[in-house]
Amino acid sequence: MSVIILQSINLVGEAFLHKLNALIPELSVSDMEKSLYFYSEILLFKIEYQRPEDKFAFLSLNDCQIMIEEVNGHWNTGELSYPYGRGINFQIVINDIDLLYGSLKKNEYPIKFDIQENWYRAETKLKGQKEFLILDPDGYLLRFVQNLGEKDVEAD
């Protein structure tokens, strides 16, 4: 198994080393400034690096990584209209769901599905997670999850 390491230089010249995940979504956004504020200030993602000239940013939160780039027509496969990302649900596993939920509430950001505990069957186990859903400024559906562990499925 090989590991890809990306080295980049931020705007003040400090070197960062990033282990790249096997899948890193790149979201097209309508307004880079608005989206960057939303992801970094409200959702508490870390800005790993940016290319302001391309209106691009690489972000992380715990072990999750995403890229955002203002729509420029380069990656479009069809016409974009709100809500972007129809039919997709990004599940983002985080360490402290209450901290993030509190940030959204403090910023009076609308919650699509309120925080709740759910258990999903996976063969003979139930996997638990505390979760809530929101739409980002462009309508991408984001499901934030904190794992609660697993337990045996009870026999009927």
Across the structure, where does each feature detected by a protein language model lie?
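Conserved active-site tyrosine of GNAT-family acetyltransferases
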Residues: 35-40, 104, 139
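Vicinal oxygen chelate
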Residues: 3-24, 46-95, 102-135, 145-156
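Conserved beta-strand-loop-alpha-helix junction that forms the acyl-donor binding cleft
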Residues: 29-31
